[in-house]
Amino acid sequence: MLRAVSTSFGTARAASAVAKKNMPNIVLVDAVRTPFVVSGTVFKDLMAVDLQKEAIKALVEKTKLPYEQLDHIICGTVIQECKTSNIAREAALLAGVPDKIPAHTVTLACISSNVAMTTGMGMLATGNANAIIAGGVELLSDVPIRYNRNARKAMLGMNKAKDVPSKLKIGGQIVKNLLSPELPAVAEFSTGETMGHSGDRLAAAFNVSRREQDEFAIRSHTLASEAAKNGKFTDVVPVFLDGKKPKTIKEDNGIRVSTLEKLSSLKPAFVKPHGTVTAANASYLTDGASAALIMTEEYALANGYKPKAYLRDYLYVAQDPKDQLLLSPAYVIPKLLDKAGLTLKDVDVFEIHEAFAGQVLANLNAMDSDYFCKEQMKRSGKFGRVPMDKLNLWGGSLSIGHPFGATGVRLATHSAHRLKEEKGQYAVIAACAAGGHGVGMLIEAYGK
C-alpha cells in the first residue's frame, strides 16, 4: 500500500492510506459552476465561450487568486464552435486572464472536464505547474449545423469554375442541397446507435424495469430540489444577462419533482413502442459551465488557501461501444478501489453520472452480479452493491442537468462538499461517456 505524509491547513497530520509515495498531494481548492439550465431557455442567446468565461471569472474572484500564481488553464467541451475551437484560451482572455498564461481545450464526450482535471493533476504531479484551473462547458442551445457534404463540395468547387455554364451548374448543385443540412451526430460513429437506444437495451439486459427507472428519476429530482432549497449548491455562481430586459440567473432551472403516475404515462423516447427510456428518466439537453482550482497541497498552504479535498487518484476505462457503451461505472469503480487498496465499505460518498436512470441502475446491478463480475471482469465473485444511502444524495444529472463538458467538475465539487457535510473520508466519482469510455476518480476529505 502506498503511503505519504499529508498535511491539513497549516499543520501536519497522519499519513493517508491512499496517498502516492514520492508524489505531491494534489488538492481541490475550490470550484464553481454557472446555473445548469435547460437548453433553449435563459442562455439561448449566449455562446459557450461566454459561459466558460463566467465560470473562470467567478472562480478567480471567489478564491481571490492572483494571476501570478496561475500556471495553466484546461477546459473540456464536446460540441465545438469553430470560431472558438480552443475555447479554454478564448474564455480565459475574455475573463481577463493575462495572455502569458497558456490555456488549452480537451474533449472526451461526457467526461471532458474530468479529462481537464486529470490532465491538470498530471502537470501538478510532475512539477510542471503549481496551480491550474480546470473546467468545462457546453451550450446546446446553439450547435453547429452545416450544409451537407454535396453542398460543401459544390461551394468549394465554385472557386475553380472558369466559365458561366460551369458556375451555373455548380450553383444548381448548391441550391439542390441547401434544404438537407447536417445536424451534430447523436449516434455513435462506430455503431450507428444512439445512446438512448443503448440505454434501453442495457436496462433490459440487467432487468431494470420501467417503474424502477421512473422511481429513480423522481428520487433524483426530489433530492436535488431538497438540496437546492437547503442551500447545498454553494458552487453555483450567478450569471448576469444584459439586454433590453437585464436579469441575473441564479439557479438551475431543470429540477422538476413529479409523480410516478405522470412519469408512467410518458411514451418511450427511443425504442418504440416497448422501450423503457423516456424523456423523464433520461438527462436533458443542458447549457452550463464549470471551473475548479487545483494545486499541489504544498503550494496551496504556502499561499494561504484552505483546500476542500484531496484528488487522490483516477482511472480511465474503455469497452465495447456496441453492447457495453454505458457500463463504464461497473468496470471502473472496482478497478479504482482495487488500485487504492480500498473496499466498497470504505467509500462514504458515491457520485455516479446519471445519463439515464436505467443506466445507473444497470451498473449497480452489474457490480452486484456474480455472473457479470466473473465473466466480464474476471473477478472471483460479485463486487457488491453501491448503497443507495450513499449515492447521489443531492440529485444528479437527471435533475440538475448535464452540460457534457462541465459535469465532471460538478461531480467532484459535490463529492467534496458531501464529504465535509456527511463527515466521510472517501468519495468515488464514476461516469460513462461516448465510445464506451468511462472515468473513476477517488477523492479524500481534507483534514479528516
From Swiss-Prot:
Organism: Caenorhabditis elegans
Name this polypeptide is given: Probable 3-ketoacyl-CoA thiolase
InterPro entries tied to this protein: Thiolase, Thiolase-like, Thiolase_acyl_enz_int_AS, Thiolase_AS, Thiolase_C, Thiolase_CS, Thiolase_N
Coiled-coil regions, chain positions: none
One example of a Gene Ontology biological process annotation: fatty acid beta-oxidation
EC number, UniProt record: 2.3.1.16
Subcellular location per the Swiss-Prot or TrEMBL entry: Mitochondrion
Reaction catalyzed: an acyl-CoA + acetyl-CoA = a 3-oxoacyl-CoA + CoA
Entry-linked CDD domains: thiolase
Annotated catalytic residues: 110, 402, 432
A GO-annotated cellular component: mitochondrial fatty acid beta-oxidation multienzyme complex
This protein's record includes keyword Cell division: no
EC supergroup of this enzyme: transferase
Spans traversing the lipid bilayer: none
Family: Belongs to the thiolase-like superfamily. Thiolase family.
Keywords tagged on the record: Acyltransferase, Fatty acid metabolism, Lipid metabolism, Mitochondrion, Transferase
Protein's pathway: Lipid metabolism; fatty acid beta-oxidation
Function as written in the Swiss-Prot or TrEMBL entry: Mitochondrial enzyme that catalyzes reactions of the mitochondrial beta-oxidation pathway.
GO molecular function, one term: acetyl-CoA C-acetyltransferase activity
SUPFAM superfamilies: Thiolase-like (SSF53901)
Gene this chain is encoded by: hadb-1
One family name in Pfam for this protein: Thiolase_N
